[in-house]
């Protein structure tokens, strides 16, 4: 399916109110993070036996105590792997200092978090996947906290620890890539095959998201089903999966993004250019905006990025 997505009908605020639009972008960024929080909250609840939800995610973790408990729990799982003669080379097996009653925002909360981050480094978590202690304690880096926990899930999965749902989907895609060679581009006669899968939950969700809002835009941004869970989106071929039968997620690079967020970032019809002179906003009209197409007095807003603006100088 190739859908037409027009800047004329938007689910966001009017184009003339930049302040309102900025607030809308912030809400979109939070919406993009929600599936990851839900997935990790479920994972932590199962591992630690403490109820955590997406809404309470940062509040439950911000004194560092549950993270230290997570580290201790994972070490116990590593010991079980060691007993089963699985390789556990360089895995940290130590007591992690922790003040369980540390008040949120306190020095003790920062100390707990620092001890957890030190353990992560010993485990082999790359610095690029870590967050700052202040980022957790003051709730400034929810995305970085999520990415760190996902990386822990990847490492833990190697030793038999049940990983988060997103990591399971990653393994599924890796197996699919290993077992099957890339298929050739579909012929014109086969492009409509995806339309027959209307009963499929993922296909229906992809269609619904890609066609919202509907329009009659002449420059169509292509969203085309190639095979189960594999789509052509614009000029790229992407793996798309359903997380917990609820969220439509796109595998991008080494991570994940919501499908709606990906479209906001890559579909030219969903981008805005903003005048440096008067602050007025206007949609991108061309199929693929480039430097030569842009007025030097304008800059481009890419609404799915956590950096709310991209400047083209």
UniProtKB/Swiss-Prot annotation:
Biological process (GO), any one: antral ovarian follicle growth
InterPro entries recorded: CH_dom, CH_dom_sf, GAR_dom, GAR_dom_sf
Gene3D superfamilies, per database record: Calponin-like domain, Gas2-like domain
Membrane topology category: Peripheral membrane protein
Region (Disordered): 175-199
Tissue: Ubiquitously expressed with highest levels in liver, lung, and kidney. Not found in spleen.
SMART domains membership: CH (SM00033), GAS2 (SM00243)
Phosphoserine: residues carrying this PTM: 183, 187
Keyword Cell cycle among UniProt keywords: yes
Residues of the GAR domain: 197-270
A cellular component annotation (GO) from this entry: stress fiber
Post-translational modification: Cleaved, during apoptosis, on a specific aspartic residue by caspases. Phosphorylated on serine residues during the G0-G1 transition phase.
Keywords, in A-Z order: Apoptosis, Cell cycle, Cell shape, Cytoplasm, Cytoskeleton, Deafness, Growth arrest, Membrane, Non-syndromic deafness, Phosphoprotein
Residue ranges annotated for the Calponin-homology (CH) domain, each copy included: 34-156
Keyword Phosphoprotein: yes
GO molecular function terms noted in the UniProt entry: actin filament binding; microtubule binding
Main location, first listed in the record: cytoplasm
Intracellular or extracellular location(s): Cytoplasm, Cytoskeleton, Stress fiber; Membrane
Amino acid composition bias (Low complexity), ranges on this chain: 188-197
Annotated positions for site Cleavage: 278-279
Function: Required to maintain microtubule bundles in inner ear supporting cells, affording them with mechanical stiffness to transmit sound energy through the cochlea.
The family this protein is said to belong to: Belongs to the GAS2 family.
Disease (UniProt): Deafness, autosomal recessive, 125: A form of non-syndromic deafness characterized by congenital sensorineural hearing loss. Sensorineural hearing loss results from damage to the neural receptors of the inner ear, the nerve pathways to the brain, or the area of the brain that receives sound information.
Protein name in the entry: Growth arrest-specific protein 2
Organism: Homo sapiens (Human)
Gene: GAS2
């Amino acid at each position: 399916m190739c859908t037409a997505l027009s800047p004329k009908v938007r689910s966001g605020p009017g184009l003339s109110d930049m302040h309102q639009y900025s607030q809308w972008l912030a809400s979109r960024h939070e919406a993009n993070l929600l599936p990851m929080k839900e997935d990790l909250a479920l994972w932590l609840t199962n591992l630690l036996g403490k109820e955590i939800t997406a809404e309470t995610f940062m509040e439950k973790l911000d004194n560092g105590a549950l993270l230290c408990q997570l580290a201790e729990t994972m070490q116990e799982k590593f010991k079980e792997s060691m007993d089963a003669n699985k390789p556990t080379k360089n895995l940290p097996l130590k007591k992690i200092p922790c003040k369980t009653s540390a008040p949120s925002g306190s020095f003790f909360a920062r100390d707990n978090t620092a001890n957890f981050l030190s353990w992560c480094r010993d485990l082999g978590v790359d610095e690029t996947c870590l967050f700052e202690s202040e980022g957790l304690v003051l709730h400034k880096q929810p995305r970085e906290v999520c990415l760190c926990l996902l990386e822990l899930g990847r490492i833990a999965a190697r030793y038999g620890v049940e990983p988060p749902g997103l990591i399971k989907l990653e393994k599924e895609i890796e197996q699919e890539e290993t077992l099957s060679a890339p298929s050739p581009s579909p012929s014109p006669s086969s492009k409509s095959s995806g339309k027959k899968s209307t009963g499929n939950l993922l296909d229906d969700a992809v269609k619904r998201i890609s066609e919202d809002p509907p329009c009659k835009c002449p420059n169509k941004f292509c969203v085309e089903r190639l095979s189960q869970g594999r789509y052509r989106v614009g000029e790229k071929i992407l793996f798309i999966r359903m997380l917990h039968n609820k969220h439509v997620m796109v595998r991008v690079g080494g991570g994940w993004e919501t499908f709606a967020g990906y479209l906001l970032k890559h579909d030219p019809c969903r981008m805005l250019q903003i005048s440096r002179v008067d602050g007025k906003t206007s949609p991108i009209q061309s199929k693929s905006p480039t430097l030569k197409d842009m007025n030097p007095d304008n800059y481009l807003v890419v609404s799915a990025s956590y950096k709310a603006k991209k400047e083209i100088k």
